[in-house]
A protein has these predicted regions:
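Nucleic-acid endo/exonuclease domains
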Residues: 1-118
Length: 118
């Protein structure tokens, strides 16, 4: 489910580019608090169907405590989850494109491809 303008924009860019992708992609064993699966916003596949790169859109709550998202406690959990996701990608040699909320207006095919190393 697309929750934010940033996620909707990323979806549109990937879809319009004709890139094969899935939303809310998870890996077995990658879990957060209370063993809840940690999902990546988007997984983009290459021509062979293998993972090319993952895309995460990080809203403001990824960078500072926001009361409506649960304040400091939720922020601390969010940071732990973000670290786990980054570590997973590093350990499994998977490219991770992280798009911060303050770059929301810059989201484009070129922006995503540059961030993915193309």
């Amino acid at each position: 489910m697309l929750d934010s303008y940033g996620e909707i924009k990323i979806h549109e860019v990937l879809e319009n580019a004709g890139l094969p992708f899935r939303e809310e992609y998870e890996f077995p064993g990658l879990v957060g608090h209370c063993d809840v699966p940690l999902r990546f916003d988007f997984c983009v596949f290459d021509d062979c169907g293998d993972i090319d790169y993952l895309v995460e859109y990080n809203g403001e709550q990824h960078y500072k405590p926001i009361k409506k998202f649960g304040g400091q406690k939720a922020f601390n959990r969010q940071r732990e989850n973000d670290i786990k996701k980054k570590r997973y990608c590093l350990d499994h040699n998977i490219k991770l494109v992280t798009i911060p909320y303050y770059d929301e207006g810059k989201i484009s095919y070129d922006y995503i491809m540059r961030a993915a190393g193309y």
